[in-house]
Design a protein with these regions (language model features):
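Short, well-ordered alpha-helical segments in soluble proteins
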Residues: 100-103, 128, 132
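Structured catalytic core of nucleotide-sugar glycosyltransferases
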Residues: 1-121, 145-155, 164-173, 177-184, ...
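Catalytic core of nucleotide-sugar-dependent glycosyltransferases
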Residues: 123-131, 197-207
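Short, flexible active-site recognition loops that position polar ligands and cofactors
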Residues: 187-198
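Short aromatic/basic micro-patch
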Residues: 143-144, 194
Length: 207
């Protein structure tokens, strides 16, 4: 597939330590869209230098709001596949090709599955999700979607679903979902969920 038909959406808030290398590592696979969620550091400058399209939020809209802006831009560019990718260095960029292959072979949504979780709340969320929807790791930030899923189901909700909503709605709507094991690296920077206590609260609230 023409790489201009693939968008890699990277939400970013104060990710100057990692964003340049993250963009560099994925841009061979498609158009890279960095959503700069009101960062106060040099995230925008470093993302642009690395070759990304940058969308700037004047006010922080959170992870779901950043995904909304990235998906809207990808759709505007005519991209047929949208891959979400975290900015903290955890995800293996070499796996993007596997996500694209699964979608080209008929899957509508591809969800990465981590081998272990750092928080009790993640275990609880995963257990509930697996029981209700058959999705092992809805909190994983590396997912792939066809543009058709986005066009039919619309944007992420205004409440903080931490990027889980579109995958779950896809299951409820009968879209074909594939899951793929991920190799996860240690975080280079802070977690997108925040500190330990706030992260657990945020994750459980999303249920």
């Amino acid at each position: 597939m023409d790489k201009h038909k693939v968008a890699i959406v990277i939400p970013a808030f104060n990710e100057e330590a990692t964003i340049y290398n993250q963009v560099q590592s994925v841009k061979e696979n498609g158009v890279v869209i960095v959503v700069n969620d009101a960062s106060t550091d040099y995230t925008e400058k470093k993302a642009l230098k690395a070759g990304a399209i940058v969308i700037n939020h004047k006010n922080n809209k959170g992870y779901d709001g950043a995904l909304n802006s990235g998906f809207f831009k990808a759709n505007e560019l005519g991209c047929e596949i949208i891959i979400t990718f975290d900015a903290d260095g955890q995800h293996d960029p070499s796996l993007i090709k596997n996500f694209i292959m699964l979608i080209n072979n008929g899957s509508d949504v591809v969800i990465g599955v981590r081998s272990n979780f750092q928080r009790v709340s993640e275990h609880i969320f995963s257990w509930v999700s697996k029981f209700k929807w058959g999705i092992d790791d809805p909190l994983c930030g590396m997912k792939g979607y066809t543009s058709n899923v986005y066009k039919k189901l619309g944007h992420f909700s205004s409440y903080d679903s931490i990027g889980t909503e579109l995958a779950i709605f896809s299951y409820n709507s009968g879209f074909k979902i594939a899951q793929i094991p991920l190799k996860v690296h240690d975080r280079i920077d802070d977690s997108r969920f925040g500190g330990r206590v706030s992260a657990n609260v945020k994750i459980l609230r999303a249920l």
